[in-house]
């Protein structure tokens, strides 16, 4: 059943044989830091956030220690146990993929948003079956992850039975690493596409006022026996917004071609890029893809346009209201049974060439390395998350 698949999927992500550290009495007694210490109320992109100080020292966590820290921080800040499970695995998967700055770093924001009322960690998403293959999920201003997981319980069996199924999510939140969600569907044997809109940081070609966000897209290709042949997960801008933000916090410049200043001129100053706009990947073509994402994730879902969404940075208690779109296709039914063979040939045509790699290969290499070495987390950020826990 679908429920059994979801349980098995989450269990398979767990790393056996690793002991959990007991939470110390001191961390249990510690109080969550004031939200104002974590978020800039005046949206100053130069603010030093926990976990980004240049001089911070790193700790290294086992996957089980990291899982416990993530889960306990979410619960401590006000997430229900049911809503925290899938979310915890997504954040852990992000860290194990080596996507530094997208896992632990954003978790402190998630916890702060819980305390400020920007997101509801306990709400139960509402599912509306528009037809046998189309589903709308109202996240009800809660986290995206529980809403996506709840929707997948309908999307997966519908795609398996009918060959294709679509799901939209509205009144939602940051979907974080999209590849976790599309990979989830691919491991269920489905060809998957996902997208999300976010707050505007990209101006239209020739303009200087942002109208769409980095608007990431992801697709995942299934392989036999619950594996993933390859997976693509990328923003529709040259780099992610987090990359610019981290450059500001670390006092680094950026290459020309990543961002524009407020007048629409190229800049190597990441702070000017954050107050100006980001460059779409491939110029006009990248903007067009970002525009498609905006249509799929706002007009089609019933969610707000990026220009109408709440701020992820400002601590104002206002919901963010992102939208998400997912498409799942049963590949054997649609291909006449030759999908796996064709994908195998496609993969071989790439990997047989020297110096090439499949999309997502680096993340898999990072996973193996971090399973051996431990997952790094800066001491200050670790203490912040422990306090939330």
Where are the model-predicted features located?
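Small-residue-enriched flexible segments
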Residues: 241-302, 319
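Active-site cofactor/substrate anionic-group-binding motifs, chiefly glycine-
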Residues: 105-152
């Amino acid at each position: 059943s679908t429920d059994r698949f979801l349980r098995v999927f989450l269990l398979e992500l767990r790393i056996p044989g690793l002991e959990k550290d007991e939470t110390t009495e001191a961390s249990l007694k510690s109080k969550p830091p004031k939200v104002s210490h974590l978020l800039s109320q005046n949206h100053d992109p130069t603010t030093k956030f926990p976990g980004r100080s240049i001089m911070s020292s790193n700790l290294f966590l086992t996957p089980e220690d990291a899982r416990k820290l993530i889960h306990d921080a979410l619960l401590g800040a006000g997430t229900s146990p049911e809503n925290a499970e899938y979310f915890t695995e997504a954040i852990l998967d992000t860290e194990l993929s080596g996507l530094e700055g997208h896992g632990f770093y954003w978790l402190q924001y998630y916890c702060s948003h819980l305390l400020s009322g920007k997101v509801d960690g306990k709400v139960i998403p509402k599912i509306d079956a528009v037809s046998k293959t189309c589903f709308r999920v109202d996240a009800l201003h809660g986290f995206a992850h529980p809403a996506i997981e709840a929707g997948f319980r309908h999307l997966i069996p519908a795609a398996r039975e009918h060959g294709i199924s679509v799901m939209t999510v509205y009144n939602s939140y940051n979907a974080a690493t999209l590849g976790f969600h599309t990979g989830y569907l691919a491991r269920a044997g489905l060809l998957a596409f996902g997208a999300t809109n976010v707050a505007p940081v990209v101006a239209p070609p020739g303009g200087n006022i942002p109208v769409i966000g980095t608007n990431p897209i992801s697709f995942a290709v299934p392989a036999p026996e619950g594996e993933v042949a390859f997976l693509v997960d990328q923003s529709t801008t040259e780099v992610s917004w987090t990359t610019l933000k981290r450059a500001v916090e670390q006092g680094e410049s950026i290459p020309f071609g990543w961002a524009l200043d407020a007048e629409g001129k190229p800049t190597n100053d990441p702070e000017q890029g954050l107050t100006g706009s980001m460059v779409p990947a491939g110029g006009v073509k990248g903007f067009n893809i970002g525009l498609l994402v905006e249509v799929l994730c706002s007009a089609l879902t019933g969610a707000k346009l990026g220009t109408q969404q709440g701020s992820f940075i400002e601590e104002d208690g206002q919901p963010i209201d992102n939208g998400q779109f997912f498409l799942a296709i049963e590949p054997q039914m649609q291909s006449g049974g030759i999908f796996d063979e064709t994908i195998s040939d496609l993969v071989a045509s790439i990997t047989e060439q020297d110096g090439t790699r499949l999309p997502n290969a680096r993340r898999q290499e990072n996973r193996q390395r971090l399973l051996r070495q431990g997952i790094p987390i800066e001491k200050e950020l670790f203490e912040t998350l422990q306090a939330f826990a």
